[in-house]
């Protein structure tokens, strides 16, 4: 009977401990959600105050009614921001007390004070128990879960010694943040090997599986801790950027290969000198051209040259089997010849009298008058 009573009492104590632990976890989760909401609202108020201050700096010195209202609104926002900062500090302390017990504030005070060189520091039992439980949970995390900037983080073992938790990999994410709207945009994401020693940056987030450091832009943007929801959203955006980059690099590979195949299968174009294309022809082939079909070619000639194969040229130009017309002139031997024109064109011959034609003979003066009335043709001859 005593054994049964002891078992019943131990079981009740165990159930009470489990219920108390669940209650603490639920309270911690509630306070964490409230803490994240306060941080988000504080960030919004800071961005709003920065934008309003920038607008007020651009206005002239003469204050108007709208400027006064804006300044009053800025003062109210600053008061709200101070209240949110106090609330955030209080919630963080309450969460520390719930997680590590009543000894957490005392331990933080001891850590803030200068330690004596002769006395080694020993962690409290509640903190050691919590850290050991954190280590077990970190080891049970599946390998496929997304992580970001996971670095070597010291974890205290139950014996009080510091043990390094090895990082599996590290991710470098380049982020651009809009100061007006507060929206975060991921520019690039690169997976690298975990770096040892730790990166030269400021720690802005840490939990059982992830540690986030702000490396660049600290002087411009300031140090702002991140919440778990913001870290998860950042990891999700980084995964989307990585997938989009992989798709953009793998997409154009297939059309390039098809273009190379078409180039190989297309026969070489035959060039015929002296052929002019039609005015309606295009400089490139149609978009739906099939391999093996020769697209139209447009050629523009800025001069001429002698062709070696004259027969082929006549055949192409349609001059084969044509009749050449010759000019036959019958004249008297006494008619003076005029010099040939300089441009090589055929000279205009004066009208002569045929042998069996009857009529008055022409005098030299009449011939000169005829030449003056009828000017000589100096047009160019083609072909």
Curated annotation (Swiss-Prot):
Residues modified as N-acetylmethionine: 1
Gene Ontology cellular-component terms listed: apicolateral plasma membrane; axon; basolateral plasma membrane; cytoplasm; dendritic spine; filopodium; filopodium membrane; neuron spine
Superkingdom of origin: Eukaryota
Modified sites of kind Cysteine methyl ester: 380
Propiece residue ranges: 381-383
Tissues in which the UniProt entry reports expression: Expression is highest in brain, intermediate in adrenal gland and kidney, and much lower or undetectable in other tissues. Isoform 1 is the predominant isoform in most tissues except brain and kidney where isoform 2 predominates.
GO BP terms: adenylate cyclase-inhibiting G protein-coupled receptor signaling pathway; cellular response to electrical stimulus; cytoskeleton organization; negative regulation of dopamine receptor signaling pathway; positive regulation of dendritic spine development; positive regulation of filopodium assembly; protein localization; protein localization to plasma membrane
Keywords, sorted A to Z: Acetylation, Cell membrane, Cell projection, Cell shape, Coiled coil, Lipoprotein, Membrane, Methylation, Palmitate, Phosphoprotein, Prenylation, Synapse
Recorded family membership: Belongs to the paralemmin family.
Name this polypeptide is given: Paralemmin-1
Species in which this protein is naturally found: Mus musculus (Mouse)
Species classification: Eukaryota, Metazoa, Chordata, Craniata, Vertebrata
């Amino acid at each position: 009977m005593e054994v049964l009573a002891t078992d019943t009492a131990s079981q009740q104590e165990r159930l009470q401990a489990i219920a108390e632990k669940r209650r603490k976890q639920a309270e911690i989760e509630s306070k964490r959600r409230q803490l994240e909401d306060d941080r988000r609202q504080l960030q919004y108020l800071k961005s709003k105050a920065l934008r309003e201050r920038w607008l007020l700096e651009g206005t002239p010195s003469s204050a108007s009614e709208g400027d006064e209202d804006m300044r009053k609104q800025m003062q109210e926002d600053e008061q709200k921001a101070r209240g949110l900062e106090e609330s955030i500090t209080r919630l963080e302390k309450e969460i520390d007390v719930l997680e590590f017990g009543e000894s957490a504030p005392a331990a933080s005070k001891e850590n803030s004070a200068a330690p004596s060189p002769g006395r080694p520091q020993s962690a409290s039992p509640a903190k050691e128990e919590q850290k050991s439980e954190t280590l077990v949970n970190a080891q049970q995390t599946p390998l496929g879960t997304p992580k970001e900037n996971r670095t070597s983080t010291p974890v205290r073992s139950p014996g009080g010694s510091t043990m390094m938790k090895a990082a599996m990999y590290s991710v470098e994410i380049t982020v651009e943040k809009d100061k007006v709207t507060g929206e975060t945009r991921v520019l690039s994401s690169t997976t690298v090997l975990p770096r040892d020693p730790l990166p030269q940056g400021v720690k802005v987030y840490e939990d059982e599986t992830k540690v986030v450091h702000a490396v660049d832009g600290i002087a411009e943007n300031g140090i702002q801790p991140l919440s778990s929801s913001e870290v998860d959203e950042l990891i999700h955006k980084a995964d989307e950027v990585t997938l989009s980059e992989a798709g953009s690099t793998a997409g154009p590979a297939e059309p390039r290969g098809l273009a190379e195949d078409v180039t190989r299968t297309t026969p070489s174009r035959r060039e015929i000198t002296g052929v002019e294309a039609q005015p309606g022809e295009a400089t490139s082939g149609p978009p739906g051209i099939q391999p093996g079909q020769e697209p139209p070619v447009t050629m523009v000639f800025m001069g001429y040259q002698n062709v070696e194969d004259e027969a082929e040229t006549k055949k192409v130009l349609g001059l084969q089997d044509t009749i050449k017309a010759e000019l036959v002139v019958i004249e008297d031997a006494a008619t003076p010849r005029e010099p040939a024109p300089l441009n090589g064109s055929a000279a205009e011959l004066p009208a002569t009298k045929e042998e069996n034609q009857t009529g008055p003979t022409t005098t030299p003066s009449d011939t000169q008058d005829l030449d003056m009335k009828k000017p000589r043709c100096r047009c160019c001859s083609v072909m």
